[in-house]
Amino acid sequence: MFFRRILLLSFLLTPLLLLSEPGEAGSFFDNDRYFLTMRSLGDAKCASPADKVIARFFREKNPKLPRETAKKYSQIVVEAAREFGVDPFLVAGIIVKESTVRANAESRGCYGLMQIKWSAHKKSIPKAFPSIRSVKDLQKPENNIRVGAYMLANFLRRNQGRVDASLDRYKGSPSTKYKSTLLKYYHRMISLYHKEKTS
């Protein structure tokens, strides 16, 4: 009877143990087929219509954002993504999640579109970007997006390309909700991207 209970218990617990394997539980981008397909495109995903898609998505999430500003930001996102080898839709998603596309956003010492914590990076940012020497410099949209894309690229490199772990680093702590929201944003942009490509 005792052994039968142990056997039954192990049978019931096995699926739970399998779910807790690294890379399975809480996996968002690393196993998402849409993200992996876009990743396989390399720099091609930075070509048109990526900028149009991002501009449209920015205005969906922030209707008060002027059309020209959305267009300008989207072009900077695509250029920064190409420069640092990251996914432009991932960068755009971070911008929406972190600041709702507001260049003057400020929260708990984090600044700008990509909510970069100046106190944590005030030594490393000027080394990589000599023209950025203050919070005022960091808040300029082009600077902020380039620094954010650069940081994301560094986190990806340190985490062997694992996006979920890199997003945890970007946020500063593991967050299922953060990654889940970003993946939802990503899927929306991919949907817009395919519509643009086929129209």
Question: What are these language model-derived features?
Answer:
Residues L17-A25:
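Sec/Tat signal peptide C-region and signal peptidase I cleavage site
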Residues S27-S199:
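Catalytic glycan-binding domains that act on GlcNAc-containing polysaccharides
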Residues L9-L17:
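Bacterial N-terminal signal peptides
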Residues M1-L8:
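Bacterial N-terminal signal peptides that target proteins for export
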